[in-house]
Amino acid sequence: MLKKVLNGTRIAKKLEFKILKQVNYKLSLGQRPPGLAVILIGSNSASTIYVKKKRFMCEQVGFISKFWKFSKNIQESKILNLIYKLNYDTTIDGILVQLPIPPNINNQKLFSSIIPTKDVDGFHPYNIGSLCQKSPYLRPCTPFGIITMLKHYKIKIRGLHAVVIGASNIVGRPMSMELLLAGCTTTITHRFTKNLKHYVKQADLIVIAIGHAHFLKGTWIKKGAIVIDVGINRLKNGEIVGDVDFKTAYKKSSYITPVPGGVGPMTVITLLNNTLKAYEQISKDCK
């Protein structure tokens, strides 16, 4: 079976051009550009880099991005007040609170305070519930970015046994819902799962998101499996690697995502696509 490295950067570039074309058309009609509000709490270096990347991408496709940065000791009520104002700001179509959020702030409370139609990260209970009910609106960016990538490469996953390693609210749980929606038989594993190798060895498709460098070895993977690596880990030497031991997993897999350049770009482009979708819905509602 032909081995392929799934190039998220290349797909994202194509989708970026498509979004820019749509935005330019809207502007030619005299409409305002889409607007994304980004809130950063604390000074996490990785978060700062991610925010810069997202804002840069906004500019590339003609979006307006507005940015608020707060110290990690900010009162939760002040963030909630800002979100309340942004919910009713007619120039803002999407609201993003960059993760991770300091432990003194209830992240679920923040996600729930964003109105569902501006929840471009897809974490509001309404949007998660809609995904579970098989009628998704704004979908969590990383899981849907992965589905978009698989579709782009025309990889058929209906009927496959998919194993998700990691059960976070951000990736693992919504990923399992996306895979169910796509027709997979889905197993979700977590830190309490006994005999993890047993489940992984049965998988036709593996999605791993646990934040543990080189955790998944090629010896665990059955020949021909599809391997999707969501992990981003920095080694002591500064190298960025995923949760998968790429060299050994590559030998066994049929398709595999690299880190960097795999899932990451798909997450960002899905955020932009969600923002455009929210913008178009708001524009339609205003007519």
UniProtKB/Swiss-Prot annotation:
Pfam families: THF_DHG_CYH, THF_DHG_CYH_C. The lineage of its organism: Bacteria, Pseudomonadati, Pseudomonadota, Gammaproteobacteria, Enterobacterales. Belongs to the tetrahydrofolate dehydrogenase/cyclohydrolase family. PROSITE patterns: THF_DHG_CYH_1, THF_DHG_CYH_2. It comes from Buchnera aphidicola subsp. Baizongia pistaciae (strain Bp). GO terms for cellular component: cytosol. Keywords: Amino-acid biosynthesis, Histidine biosynthesis, Hydrolase, Methionine biosynthesis, Multifunctional enzyme, NADP, One-carbon metabolism, Oxidoreductase, Purine biosynthesis. Its EC number is 1.5.1.5, 3.5.4.9. Catalyzes the oxidation of 5,10-methylenetetrahydrofolate to 5,10-methenyltetrahydrofolate and then the hydrolysis of 5,10-methenyltetrahydrofolate to 10-formyltetrahydrofolate. GO terms for biological process: L-histidine biosynthetic process; methionine biosynthetic process; purine nucleotide biosynthetic process; tetrahydrofolate interconversion. This is Bifunctional protein FolD. Homodimer. NADP(+) binds at G166, A167, S168, I232. InterPro entries: Aminoacid_DH-like_N_sf, NAD(P)-bd_dom_sf, THF_DH/CycHdrlase, THF_DH/CycHdrlase_cat_dom, THF_DH/CycHdrlase_CS, THF_DH/CycHdrlase_NAD-bd_dom. Pathway: One-carbon metabolism; tetrahydrofolate interconversion. It comes from the Bacteria. It catalyses: (6R)-5,10-methylene-5,6,7,8-tetrahydrofolate + NADP(+) = (6R)-5,10-methenyltetrahydrofolate + NADPH; (6R)-5,10-methenyltetrahydrofolate + H2O = (6R)-10-formyltetrahydrofolate + H(+). GO terms for molecular function: methenyltetrahydrofolate cyclohydrolase activity; methylenetetrahydrofolate dehydrogenase (NADP+) activity.
